[in-house]
Amino acid sequence: MSQFPPDVHALIDASVAEDQTFNDPTTQAVVPPEIQGTGWLRAKATGVLAGVDVAIAVFQRVDPNLNASAILQDGTPLCPGDNIAVVRGSAAGILRAERIALNFMQRMSGIASDTNRYVEAVRGLNARIVDTRKTVPGHRFLDKYSVRMGGGYNHRLNLADGILIKDNHIQANAFREMGLKDVIELALASASHTIKVEVE
């Protein structure tokens, strides 16, 4: 996932600004700018990796002179102690970026790992693990990517991706004395041939 859509770059920028990475009095006070270092991103638990490219992008956004590279790729099963990525360069730059990079990777790997547990639970059955739009605002692309890394499938990315009739749509038409069949007929009549109509 080295090519990100613009909203992911914007999310990284917002996270860097939120954490005030360029105004870190602790690092400025105790880590001279000339000190060079190496940071290893290591797994602390079993799971499935997701977000390593995002973590690398964070390091490079905070300090473009940092040399960060992935050792493992997204979708890889993890064991405690596995080296995931390495970053070399200014120790101050590494320290300023590490928490944001880890936050992204931990969240994404958590989603991938949880998804994979469900995928494994239904293996051999005629079932798929499919996600929803119930994502943290701004994180939808990354959340859905993480689901895929865990072996799950994406449903709708947004409202425009299909018709999904839910109980709220039926209740909204109750005053017109319309039932489920009527609402489905309305949806089918307005849907183009490329739009899937589903009922939850």
What are these regions (language model features)?
Residues 2-200:
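Acidic/glycine-rich phosphate/pyrophosphate-binding loops and surrounding catalytic core
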